Curated annotation (Swiss-Prot):
Name of the protein: Hemocyte protein-glutamine gamma-glutamyltransferase
GO cellular component: membrane
Cited function: Catalyzes the cross-linking of proteins and the conjugation of polyamines to proteins.
Cofactor: Ca(2+)
Location relative to the cell: Membrane
Species in which this protein is naturally found: Tachypleus tridentatus
């Protein structure tokens, strides 16, 4: 069911992946409304508190709860949750991790007598907690000061008793469901003088979050290395790599998993997913739900995807600076999908949700990422007789980059050794250019070509290993097309993630190459064997049969363009050399177009034909010169340009094709701090931009975000003159001490996706 036949999954996804609430009781709608109200209320507690109501006194003989102390901050320090804003709100929220104990104190309205007062805790999870499902826990409080059960079970011990006050320590097993738990305290007098006294129940109004625990060896998300935990669980700012294989560009992203709106939004996501409450103990199923719910296809998820203009009715994907503003909007609108996201935005939000829930997670960027729609492990590109690409001949495509996530967990459902990093992808399927929601798929299984293991490993494998085949119209061929080229090294050329413990605001020294974790080195026997192993498993090994070699005595070479700065011209060249002792007649086509990062052609920029009669050992050049005026108005989202070159030798029927792409480089924003950085004290942030164009920039605005300093906000700016150095200043007041990251973006009608960031230290 899982991991096989992705082509069928694509065709049937509208029904196969449609998610509906699992609980169909008549009160489910009311339950969801109540949940939303509570989450919005909890999110708002940073600004106003909600008084706790108490159980009314039912008689002098009954043991009444006067108050409950949850030791929210003390428990948070022990459970590595002290960073969550909800812990420090006006009414602090208890946030715990499974697999370790926590402490509470209860004050009664009279002295507690263990011989007469029967006391128990009821801890429940979900709409209808049940003992049989493990979502309702009954914990009798005895006089024991030690735990009597093993660590796989809930338990409670009496740490201290002082008259009307008792202190309890409660043991949470390492395999309980994650989410919001509620607690009741039930007491009943058992004296012979008053044998019929009714039990009294006190419901704790404060909810308790229980999360996955990467610090606990018994938890399936356990991660041993402390530096890894700091990076993949605790780091709330990182980098997501975009750009191209030759020009990777790290974009600063604020994950913001500790922001006050994020955990409530995560609970809403899990509710909307329809995931069974008991299944929420399993990180495999939780991650699969995240993969489905971060996009809005079929299930009212977080983000709506859009890969081309217009974005006027929402926020353009490149204007987001982090995840928390997206999740906050989703929560405040009670689950209305937020507009708009693209793969790296989906991955950023998925990373935030996973880390917030305690699942170690990282973003992964695959350069030249294949979208194989027919499970052949090939990406077919088709060209007409004139050498122009036929855009709608296939739904296969190669994205200049695609971003997904890896999560860290054990995989008891797979053979030994396939735990560790698991790929999952929350980018939604689109009928023309989207990719599938995916995973979790064992990265080791992908590397080995073991595509039979759950979940969706065939698709992930093809993303990094598919072969690229070029075809051209040919009337003399039985199929109407001739095979120009097979490129086994075009796809999955580089996979990057942020390096542990390294942070670079001015370059990309913090990029880590993890290509070898996903695939063996290109050209090695191991690499080809993994591909052929996967091809045999999929039944399409015939696709890798190479054509018979033809006489090839004319040499062609498309010169790479490393990078150009926006506003500068560029030059494209194909070198041609007749290496034979005979005359050769060559027809060649060279073209340049803007492209979306998904590989879809944006606008054609320039095209040049060449017909040459080459004498023995003669050299020729086909080239095009492109000026700024010819390409600036034709650039699309990420300022990427695709080059195609195709040539045919008449005498030998030798054919040749090549492609290349590059990014037009944009300036960075420069951030300067004016004043002292101290909690509660205003300072000035100055943002500088040098206009690289010889034209006016209008409709200008900045987006700024800095966790612990300010949430995301937008400010407009005046028009910026040609080649002007513009400076915009804003006044900010830090809210929290410690190291803080400030991220800013700039956009105008003529220039978009200009980014800058700065690391600062805020004093208490």
């Amino acid at each position: 069911m899982y991991g096989f036949g992705r082509g069928n999954m694509f065709r049937n996804r509208s029904t196969r992946y449609r998610r509906r609430p699992r609980y169909r009781a008549e009160n489910y709608h009311s339950y969801m409304l109540d949940l939303l109200e509570n989450m919005n209320e909890e999110f708002g507690r940073n600004w106003w508190g909600t008084p706790e109501s108490h159980q009314p006194d039912s008689g002098p003989s009954s043991l009444q709860v006067e108050s409950v102390e949850l030791y929210t901050r003390d428990n948070a320090r022990e459970h590595n949750t002290f960073m969550y804003d909800l812990v420090d709100g006006t009414k602090p929220v208890l946030i715990l991790r499974r697999g370790q104990p926590f402490s509470i104190a209860i004050r009664f309205k009279r002295n507690y007598n263990p011989q007469q007062d029967r006391l128990k805790l009821e801890i429940g999870f979900g709409q209808q907690p049940l003992i049989t499902k493990g979502t309702l826990i009954m914990l009798p409080v005895s006089g024991s000061d030690t735990f009597t059960k093993d660590k796989t079970q809930w338990d409670v011990r009496l740490r201290q008793h002082d008259g009307a006050v008792i202190t309890l320590e409660i043991q949470i097993p390492a395999a309980v469901a994650v989410g919001v738990w509620k607690m009741k305290i039930v007491s009943q007098l058992t004296s012979e003088e008053q044998p019929n006294v009714s039990a009294v129940t006190h419901e704790c109004k404060n909810k308790t979050y229980i999360l996955f625990n990467p610090w606990c060896k018994q938890d399936s998300v356990y991660m041993e290395d402390e530096q890894w935990r700091k990076e993949y669980v605790l780091s709330d700012v990182g980098k997501i790599f975009t750009g191209s294989f030759k020009q990777p560009v790290g974009r600063r992203w604020i994950f913001g998993q500790f922001t006050d709106s994020v955990l409530p939004a995560c609970m809403l996501i899990l509710e909307r997913s329809g995931l069974d409450y008991t299944a929420r103990s399993n990180p495999i199923k939780v991650v699969r739900a995240i993969s489905a719910m971060v996009n809005n296809i079929d299930d009212e998820g977080v983000l709506e995807g859009r890969w081309q203009e217009p974005y006027d009715d929402g926020v353009a994907p490149w204007m987001w600076t982090g995840s928390s503003a997206i999740l906050e909007k989703y929560l405040k609108t009670r689950g209305v999908p937020v507009k708009y996201g693209q793969c790296w935005v989906f991955a950023g939000v998925a990373n935030t949700v996973s880390r917030a829930l305690g699942i170690p997670s990282r973003t992964v960027t695959n350069y030249d990422s294949a979208h194989d729609t027919d499970d052949t492990l090939t990406i077919d590109k088709w060209f007409d007789k004139n050498g122009d690409k036929i855009e709608d001949a296939t739904s296969d495509s190669i994205w200049n980059f695609h971003v997904w996530n890896d999560c860290w967990m054990a995989r008891p459902d797979l053979p030994t050794g396939y735990g560790g990093w698991q790929a999952y992808d929350s980018t939604p399927q689109e009928t023309s250019e989207g990719v599938y929601q995916t995973g979790p798929a064992s990265v080791l299984a992908v590397q080995r070509g073991e595509i039979g293991y759950m979940f969706d490993s065939p698709f992930v494998f093809s993303e990094v290993n598919a072969d690229v085949v070029h075809w051209q119209e040919d009337d003399s061929s039985e199929t109407g097309y001739k095979k120009l080229k097979i490129d086994s090294y075009r796809v999955g050329r580089l996979l990057l993630t942020k390096k542990i413990g390294v942070d670079d605001d001015f370059g990309d020294a913090d990029a880590e190459d993890i290509t070898d974790q996903y695939k063996n080195k290109e050209g090695t026997d191991e690499e080809r064997m993994s591909v052929l192993n996967a091809a045999r498993s999929s039944g399409f090994n015939y696709a890798f049969n190479l054509p018979s070699p033809e006489k090839e005595d004319v040499y062609f070479n498309l010169l790479d363009i490393e990078k150009i700065k926006i506003g500068q011209p560029f030059h494209v060249t194909v070198n041609i050399e007749n290496q034979s002792s005979e005359t050769r007649r060559v027809s060649a086509v060279l073209s340049a177009s803007s492209i979306y990062y998904t590989g879809i052609t944006g606008r054609k920029i320039k095209r040049e034909n060449g017909n040459f009669s080459l004498q023995p050992h003669q050299k020729e050049v086909l080239s095009i010169e492109v000026t700024p005026d010819e390409y600036l108005e034709k650039l699309v989202d990420y300022a990427m340009i695709k080059l195609y070159a195709i040539a045919t030798v008449k005498e030998t029927q030798q054919t040749w094709s090549e492609e290349d792409d590059f990014m037009v480089e944009k300036p960075n924003l420069e951030l300067e701090i004016r004043g002292n950085l101290q909690v509660g004290t205003a300072f000035v942030l100055a943002i500088s931009l040098t206009n690289p164009l010889k034209r006016v920039l209008d409709n200008c605005f900045f987006t700024i975000e800095a966790p612990g300093v300010t949430g995301a906000f937008r400010v407009t700016n005046r028009d910026i003159q040609p080649e002007e150095v513009a400076v915009h200043t804003v006044r900010l007041i830090p809210q929290k001490p410690g190291p803080r990251k400030i991220v800013a973006t700039f956009s105008s009608r003529q220039l978009i996706q200009v980014v800058g960031s700065k690391q600062v230290e805020v004093l208490d």
